[in-house]
Amino acid sequence: GWRKPERVKVKAADGITDLYGVMYRPFDMDSTRKYPIIINVYPGPQENFVPQSFTLDDNGNESLAQLGFIVINVGFRGSCFTRGRNYHCFGYGNLRDYALADCKFVIEQLANRYSFIDLDRVGIYGHSGGGFMAAASILTYPDFYKVAVAASGNHDNNIYTKWWGETYHGVKMHEKKVGKQDSVMYSFESKIPTTIELAKNLKGKLLLITGDMDINVHMAHTIRLANALMQANKRFDLMLIPGADHGLGSPYYVNLIRYYFIENLLGQRLDNVDMSSID
């Protein structure tokens, strides 16, 4: 009963640039029904997240689809260097927002193309930069995304590693003439927009996940976003995983994400206290 994932080609939000991705469907899919769609994201910009070779379960997409979802991976403008300098530099100076419009437009195009996609039930999730993007997406387009899971997200790149922000967002240089000899003093500024600034926009269901031993993206990123959501009087969910570093992937973590989408996109409440494996 195995079905091959489908390669898809769509346009970026500019209506010109071609974007490429992969779509996964339930093996027992009924094409006369409507299915929620979930996009698994990672915006780069240092690598391409879209599978380019065969594996049994690309980034967990295949197994997630079998629970009753359409699952997609798509590469966005700015996501990698392999398509040339202009493509890769699209996000320079816009590190928070550059992939968001493409992502939304991709889902809208696929819903136009395939009648089985339900645009009223759209989910998004990602890890690390993907967690950053998932949170930014549901806070930027709160009427479009109904559910988001943001794991280990670098939600405030002003406290992330400087090489990341300065490389991919850029640094502004200011000149100021000083003294009688018109000497020039230079100052540098790197201020990157954050998801924290968007917290007041939340309407859907948002799950934040972080490990308390993450030495790559410190848990402070998630705590800052959680605090902003609380200050905005928003309901959200938070999971702190004890002893976990940046690379999450335990069965508990995987099933936590599955449970969240099943309950909030499929409307199936799972009341068992035990975190059973979902196959």
State the predicted function of each range.
Residues M29-R83, F132:
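Short substrate-entry loop that stabilizes the transition state in hydrolases
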Residues Y24, N40-V41, Y125, I209:
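Short hydrophobic segments within beta-strands
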Residues I16-D18, P36-Y42, D102:
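Conserved long hydrophobic alpha-helices within structured protein cores
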